[in-house]
């Protein structure tokens, strides 16, 4: 297994540690993620169920699957995955997020293994998972290709990675930077760096270079009239998500 340089950007970590206490406030600084979460969960659960032949109508359809949530924050994705039966490890480089995540999981009666660590450190330790959730992280790392190589090594052969990020174009600047940070003030200014955004074609190329096989991509589209998100087969102009496999 190859060595993985640390791709953590300290300035990016500091941004999220400063907001840690607000993770579970649906009207706080993580309001955009709370609004987006139903779409994220719908895509994630369907992809996992399809890949591992699980029936979402059962009580714990993901029982027996080991899942890693990279950049878990306060646990907005880790907790639903645990409720569905997965053995969940939540990893975050921002240590300040983890007390919030642990307390909320305990209050919810969920067993989640939250760790202050990075994808690279877990890969170096030889950890492997059936599923890796890599949601809204890749645009915050210093070296996306090196980071994705680590996430590849974290997957068991045949394992599934779900990776979401933000496209890089004038529309994404208008919506993710000007709209979310300046006009609506959903996020503190500087939360995102537009130059770090990645186009879908660039991400597919990076995933392939990392040894993964991209199998799907969809857009997450925000409707400003209904104030709801939906999944789109065609509109990947701002937020989008991909599914890829580690070959067996």
UniProtKB/Swiss-Prot annotation:
**What UniProt keywords are attached to this protein's entry?**
Methyltransferase, S-adenosyl-L-methionine, Transferase, Ubiquinone biosynthesis
Cross-referenced InterPro entries, in alphabetical order?
SAM-dependent_MTases_sf, UbiG_MeTrfase
For molecular function, the Gene Ontology terms on record are: 2-polyprenyl-6-hydroxyphenol methylase activity; 3-demethylubiquinol 3-O-methyltransferase activity; polyprenyldihydroxybenzoate methyltransferase activity
Catalysed transformations (reactions): a 3-demethylubiquinol + S-adenosyl-L-methionine = a ubiquinol + S-adenosyl-L-homocysteine + H(+); a 3-(all-trans-polyprenyl)benzene-1,2-diol + S-adenosyl-L-methionine = a 2-methoxy-6-(all-trans-polyprenyl)phenol + S-adenosyl-L-homocysteine + H(+)
Among its keywords, does the record have Nuclease?
no
Question: Which CDD domains does the record match to this protein?
Answer: AdoMet_MTases
Q: What's the EC number here?
A: 2.1.1.222, 2.1.1.64
Pathway involvement of the protein, from the record:
Cofactor biosynthesis; ubiquinone biosynthesis
Example GO biological process term? Answer: methylation
Q: Which SUPFAM superfamilies match?
A: S-adenosyl-L-methionine-dependent methyltransferases
Task: Establish whether keyword Phosphoprotein is in the entry.
Answer: no
Q: Identify the residues that bind S-adenosyl-L-methionine.
A: 40, 71, 92, 135
**Which Gene3D superfamilies does this chain map to?**
Vaccinia Virus protein VP39
> Could you say which protein family the record assigns here?
Belongs to the methyltransferase superfamily. UbiG/COQ3 family.
The task this protein performs is described as: O-methyltransferase that catalyzes the 2 O-methylation steps in the ubiquinone biosynthetic pathway.
Under the heading PANTHER family, the entry gives: METHYLTRANSFERASE, UBIQUINONE BIOSYNTHESIS O-METHYLTRANSFERASE, MITOCHONDRIAL
From the Swiss-Prot or TrEMBL record, give the protein name. Ubiquinone biosynthesis O-methyltransferase
The scientific name of the source species is Ruegeria pomeroyi (strain ATCC 700808 / DSM 15171 / DSS-3) (Silicibacter pomeroyi)
Q: Which gene encodes it?
A: ubiG
């Amino acid at each position: 297994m190859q060595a993985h340089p640390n791709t953590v950007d300290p300035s990016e970590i500091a941004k999220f540690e400063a907001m840690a206490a607000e993770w579970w406030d649906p009207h706080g600084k993580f309001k955009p993620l709370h609004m987006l979460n139903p779409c994220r969960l719908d895509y994630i659960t369907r992809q996992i169920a399809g890949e591992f032949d699980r029936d979402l109508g059962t009580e714990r359809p993901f029982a027996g699957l080991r899942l890693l949530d990279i950049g878990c924050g306060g646990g907005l994705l880790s907790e639903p995955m645990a409720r569905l039966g997965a053995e969940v490890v939540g990893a975050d480089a921002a240590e300040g997020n983890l007390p919030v995540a642990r307390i909320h999981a305990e209050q919810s009666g969920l067993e989640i293994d939250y760790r202050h660590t990075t994808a690279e450190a877990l890969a170096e330790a030889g950890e492997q998972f059936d599923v890796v959730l890599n949601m809204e992280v890749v645009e915050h790392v210093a070296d996306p290709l090196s980071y994705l190589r680590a996430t590849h090594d974290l997957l068991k052969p045949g394992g599934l990675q779900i990776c979401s990020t933000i496209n890089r174009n004038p529309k994404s600047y208008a919506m993710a930077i000007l709209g979310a940070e300046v006009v609506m003030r959903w996020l503190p200014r500087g939360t995102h760096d537009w130059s770090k955004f990645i186009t879908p074609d660039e991400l597919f190329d990076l995933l392939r270079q990392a040894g993964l096989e991209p199998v799907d991509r969809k857009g997450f589209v925000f409707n400003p009239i209904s104030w709801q998100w939906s999944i789109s087969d065609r509109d990947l102009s701002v937020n989008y998500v991909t599914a890829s496999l580690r070959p067996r």
